[in-house]
UniProtKB/Swiss-Prot annotation:
Listed GO MF terms: 4 iron, 4 sulfur cluster binding; iron ion binding
Family that this chain belongs to: Belongs to the NfuA family.
Keywords recorded for this protein, A-Z: 4Fe-4S, Iron, Iron-sulfur, Metal-binding
Encoding gene, per UniProt annotation: nfuA
Superkingdom classification of source: Bacteria
Organism: Pectobacterium atrosepticum (strain SCRI 1043 / ATCC BAA-672)
Function of the protein: Involved in iron-sulfur cluster biogenesis. Binds a 4Fe-4S cluster, can transfer this cluster to apoproteins, and thereby intervenes in the maturation of Fe/S proteins. Could also act as a scaffold/chaperone for damaged Fe/S proteins.
Listed cofactors: [4Fe-4S] cluster
List of residues binding [4Fe-4S] cluster: 149, 152
Annotated GO biological process: iron-sulfur cluster assembly; protein maturation
Name used for this protein in its record: Fe/S biogenesis protein NfuA
Length: 191
């Protein structure tokens, strides 16, 4: 479920030492399974533990996860990173916005999962996103770009060298990827 590095456990131990005895941490997702999902960590005193919580025991601490957040924290990583600029706690939860799908799920769901959990976070850095519109009978994934990708001069490169390569590698049953977005500059353009 969740992995907490030794460095992060040490960091939490220092913080927990200043709290009520028996206090541990709670890891949660607000708005799980939506584009607005946000992850967080808080203190979890003994009287805040719910019967439906899952407890994840680590070498130095325990983490409580509520029933609703649990599936969205699959493969989550919490680390405490120190470099020349200082230190920070990082929480990466690739499934927070969309629940991980099983390998036996329909192709459409598996492709959508990869787009939402791996490709869109990269495009979001430029204000963009991509949506799967359909998968044709002859194995083409039909995509539509939005946000900062709409009208971007790099969209062909992103499609062929990034998205298509990744999707074809993960899903050999796909034959290619096509873009149905109108990229000519106009009223619909993002910039």
């Amino acid at each position: 479920m969740i992995r907490i590095t030794d460095a992060a456990q040490e960091h939490f131990l220092k913080l927990l030492a200043k709290q009520e005895e028996g206090t541990q941490i709670r890891v949660f997702v607000i708005n799980p399974g939506t584009p607005n999902a946000e992850c967080g960590v808080s203190y979890c005193p003994p009287d805040a533990v719910e019967a439906s919580d899952t407890v994840v025991k680590f070498e130095k601490i325990s983490a409580y996860v509520d029933e609703l957040s649990s599936p969205y924290l699959e493969d989550a990583d919490i680390d405490f990173v120190t470099d020349q600029l200082g230190s920070q706690l990082t929480l990466k939860a690739p499934n927070a916005k969309m629940r991980k799908v099983d390998d036996s799920a329909p192709l459409m769901e598996r492709v959508e999962y990869v787009l939402q959990s791996q490709i869109n976070p990269q495009l979001a850095g430029h204000g963009g996103r991509v949506t799967l519109m359909e998968i044709t009978d002859d194995g083409l994934a039909i995509l539509q770009f939005g946000g900062g990708c709409n009208g971007c001069s790099m969209v062909d490169f992103t499609l062929k060298e990034g998205i298509e390569k990744e999707l074809l590698e993960k899903f050999p049953e796909l034959k290619g990827v096509r873009d149905l977005t109108e990229h000519q500059r106009g009223e619909h353009s993002y910039y």
